[in-house]
């Protein structure tokens, strides 16, 4: 059985650029139609090294053509690409603490860096769904469906400079970025 691997499509790059701007080297991103780990569930994507590994049943030729939940999922995975490319140890962080919570609490005074690796993925994908897709029903944290202003306050530093490593999750893993 042939393994499919591809780069991002022009439409995927255009979509991801709405959120990440020039902070990602899009030509480096690979999408694989295979599991990264043998135990990876079918409905799971792993993005440990700047490339996405979807089970063959979830692999699409262009994720912009997917339904809104699939686009949300793709943008969550693009957040891990962004983290990896900025130097965050996504693979190490995922291995050390399997099961990081995806849940997040938006609050004034918080920044994107206050959230863990997985929560950042959902927070950014939820913001994308609200701001650009106008589809609050696909958000993981639907209670923030009317909180675009709060998202933009929390994301102010990221929106001003998505390429800044200061946006990465705080803690030991981020300190490794500076080492």
Regions found by a protein language model. Give the residues of each.
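Short pre-active-site segment immediately N-terminal to the catalytic Zn-binding motif
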Residues: 22, 42-44, 53-75, 111-115
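Metalloprotease/metallohydrolase-associated module, dominated by Zn2+-dependent proteases
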Residues: 6-19, 23-24, 47-49, 85-179
């Amino acid at each position: 059985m042939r393994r499919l691997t591809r780069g991002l499509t022009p439409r995927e790059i255009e979509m991801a650029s709405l959120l990440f701007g020039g902070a990602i080297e899009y030509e480096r991103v690979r999408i694989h139609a295979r599991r990264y780990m043998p135990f990876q569930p079918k409905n799971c994507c792993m993005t440990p090294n700047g490339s996405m590994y979807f089970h063959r049943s979830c692999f699409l030729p262009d994720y912009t053509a997917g339904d809104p939940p699939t686009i949300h999922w793709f943008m969550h995975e693009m957040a891990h690409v962004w983290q990896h490319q900025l130097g965050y140890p996504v693979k190490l962080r995922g291995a050390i603490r399997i099961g990081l919570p995806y849940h997040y609490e938006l609050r004034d005074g918080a920044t994107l860096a206050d959230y863990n690796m997985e929560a950042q993925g959902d927070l950014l994908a939820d913001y994308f769904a609200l701001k650009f897709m106008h589809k609050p029903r696909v958000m993981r944290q639907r209670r923030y469906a009317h909180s675009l202003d709060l998202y933009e306050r929390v994301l102010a530093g990221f929106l001003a400079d998505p390429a800044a490593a200061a946006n990465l999750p705080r803690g030991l893993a981020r300190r490794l970025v500076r080492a």
